[in-house]
Amino acid sequence: MSSTKKPLVLTILDGYGHREEQQDNAILNAKTPVMDRLWQQQPHTLIAASGLDVGLPDGQMGNSEVGHVNLGAGRIVYQDLTRLDKEIKDGDFFTNPTLTAAVDKAVKAGKAVHIMGLLSAGGVHSHEDHILAMVELAAKRGATAIYLHAFLDGRDTPPRSAEPSLKRFTEKFAALGKGRIASIIGRYYAMDRDNRWDRVQLAYDLLTQAKGEFTADNAVVGLQAAYARNENDEFVKPTVIQAAGEPDAAMNDGDALIFMNFRADRARQITRTFVNADFDGFKRDKVVNFGDFIMLTEYAADIKVACAYPPASLENTFGEWLMKHDKTQLRISETEKYAHVTFFYNGGVEEPFKGEDRILINSPKVATYDLQPEMSSAELTEKLVGAIASGKYDVIICNYPNGDMVGHTGDYDAAVKAVETLDNCIEQVVAAVQAVDGQLLITADHGNAEQMRDPATGQAHTAHTSLPVPLIYVGNKEVKAVEGGKLSDIAPTMLSLMEMEIPQEMTGKPLFIVE
């Protein structure tokens, strides 16, 4: 057997959806001679990346975490959002032992119950329906001091869409006759994932000390003041919500804190700030010794606090199956999507499999990626091309974040530039794969950059879409594309192209049939 391997490369263009209409479509309007040529000349198909096809509620847009879990699992994986919706509908949520024990302990000790999370109907990191259920659970179990610390979205939802959510919760607390919204802050600060500790510190001080740059009598007034300062939801500066005569809602020893985000990647940093004894991201002026800190789902295996909904383990994901067959694999991306091609792709497993190498390219340190739409794609491509040529790997899995990260800024011109940058990168990847007689699949995890304006509101469209994504084959086999596929069909497709057995746990089907 030759020691030089001919790799199968999976290139995931994050946020690169397929939409026929040209209006506000940064992908269709960009100059993409390489992708155009591949689409015309190579076997290709469109695959579903949203809703029930990826284990989300019907019609729910896809996202990167969900996309990569399905890509790696080779079966539809029912997501936390769907699981939690069902728990609430069936009533089981209200008897969850972890949540009820934390609330009961705080009530018994006369302490407050703090609930924090992304107050959004976006369904990507959280859902406000779950937060509402948590408020109801706390109230039903006798909590009177119930404080909601609302992180505002504007990224997976329109840029200025928080007001109805804040009104809904203000009315809910009024109806209960207990509890209130205690603070609002944009997710840019509270949910950073790129070690920008100066941002996280502003959120931490707001939550622990009720200390913010701004104060308002109620949440809607606080939000409107932020809009007047030209801050969209995502960027709302720390605002304490406290009417005259109300006690402050700072977090104190013995209080319960329940973090209602279900997606891990943007929940980890702020969680570590609260719970790590050796935390050194910044100097914490106040360290709170909570009665309980509960994470809704497991944000990381090394965060040692209680978890209301631990992960269900996935057997025989693509990466694990490769390991069992002594195959070598490489995962490579920038900071922004590194967790996706490793942790999420491996079904929530943090440790690399035997034979799995990883390369992390630092994303550029800019405030928002419209300022540098090419991101770190040149360095990423250089490393990827080198890995393809090395002969070391049977499989290489790469994610280019540009379409998604620049799409999220809502800046159309920057998104076009991002897409044109990707086209140049793909040209180099195709050449590298062909030079070693390897195989290449090009796809996406969900859409974004193909819809840069919301036709209903006229606002910039910063969220993902529920549109299909492309799947293109470039390689040395004569193959025929199958229609009607979805993300969970990609792992079986790859195994089939490698002429490997498909494990029974993978219920997806190959989308390229060798002729």
UniProtKB/Swiss-Prot annotation:
UniProt-annotated binding residues for substrate: H125, R155, D156, R187, R193, R263, A264, D265, R266, K337
Any matching Pfam family: iPGM_N
Name of the molecule in the record: 2,3-bisphosphoglycerate-independent phosphoglycerate mutase
GO molecular function, one term: phosphoglycerate mutase activity
GO-annotated biological processes: glucose catabolic process; glycolytic process
Catalytic reaction list: (2R)-2-phosphoglycerate = (2R)-3-phosphoglycerate
Membership in a protein family: Belongs to the BPG-independent phosphoglycerate mutase family.
Gene this protein is translated from: gpmI
Gene3D superfamilies per the UniProt record, alphabetical: Alkaline Phosphatase, subunit A, BPG-independent phosphoglycerate mutase, domain B
Keyword terms of this UniProt record: Glycolysis, Isomerase, Manganese, Metal-binding
Classification lineage: Bacteria, Pseudomonadati, Pseudomonadota, Gammaproteobacteria, Enterobacterales
UniProt-listed CDD domains: iPGM
Subunit comment: Monomer.
Recorded metabolic or biological pathway in which this protein acts: Carbohydrate degradation; glycolysis; pyruvate from D-glyceraldehyde 3-phosphate: step 3/5
GO cellular component, as recorded: cytosol
Keyword Ribosomal protein: no
EC number: 5.4.2.12
Cofactor: Mn(2+)
